[in-house]
Structures are given as structure tokens and as C-alpha cells.
């Protein structure tokens, strides 16, 4: 899978403990709009997806997380690798540690029906909702609206992936 870009905040000590948590994310585009999870509480957009569990493939994690977070059922035969983003930064939990994450993005189609979500407690608290949104709106919101305690590098990652998709003609 191609490397889309890296985000390295260079604010960490490599002598600390690395916390590694890779994730997989769904890119579903319909009629010029992209499926995003909107945090109503903190007003930001993210691609549906999340952490890859032990012994789980990137594709299976993306399918599972997309259904849990967005209620969308991915059509497995439609999955195409898009690329990944490598992120490294100081840990949110311990200043002596650092966080490493590869975020794998997949283009895919989904079934027409939208099912109920199966949200984690923090996702329910943030009022995660599925929205098909114009990419420029999601980019603007992620970069220009105050998001409370949310980590800005994650929001910038999503904005940059949306910009790449636009540059490569996925929304025309």
C-alpha cells in the first residue's frame, strides 16, 4: 500500500515507551459526497474506521469498524487499497511516551441500507452520526472550528486525505 504522507510532530522522546495502535478507515463516495462520522459534541469529521485488533487484517478491521461506527455494511468485493498515513507524536497519556499509528484507507462500496450503530461509550458521548458530506465542508470544519479536547493531528490527517482524494479526481 502506498504511503500518502507522514505526520511527525517531533515532540516526543524516542527513549520513552512506544504505544502502537494501527487503524483502518473506509472511504465511501456517493454523488460527490463522502461518508464521514460527525462528532456532534465536538463538531469534527472523521472517516469511519478504527483500531485493528490482534490477528485481524486491515480490511476486516475496516469492515467491522465501519459497521459499528456508521451502520454501513461494506461490500467486500469492492474494497480497493487507497493508501496509508504514518503518524508519530507524543502520547496523550504520558509525556515520557510516544504514539505510533499507521492509518490504512480503503475505497469501497456499501450496501444501500443503513443499520444501527454499535458505539463505544466515548463515541456515544460524542454523538457520532453518519453524514454524507461535501469534502470541502469537512476540511473547513476540521481546520477552523474549535473541537474542545480533540487531538488536532487526527483532524488534520483526515483533512489532508480528503484533499488528496479531491486532487486525484475522486469527487468529479
Give the label of every model feature segment:
Residues 18, 44-45, 87-90:
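Short, solvent-exposed loop/turn segments at secondary-structure junctions
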Residues 52, 85, 110, 135-138:
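Hydrophobic pocket-lining residues within nucleotide cofactor-binding pockets
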Residues 29-69, 73:
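Conserved Nudix-box catalytic region and its N-terminal flanking loop in Nudix hydrolases
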Residues 73-83:
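A short coil-to-beta-strand element that immediately follows conserved catalytic motifs
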Residues 18-19, 96-102, 122-127:
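A generic structural micro-feature
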Residues 44, 114-172:
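Nudix hydrolase/Nudix homology domain
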Residues 1-25:
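Acidic, metal-coordinating catalytic segment for phosphate/diphosphate chemistry
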Residues 87-117, 131:
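Active-site-adjacent beta-strand/loop module that shapes the phosphate/pyrophosphate-binding cleft
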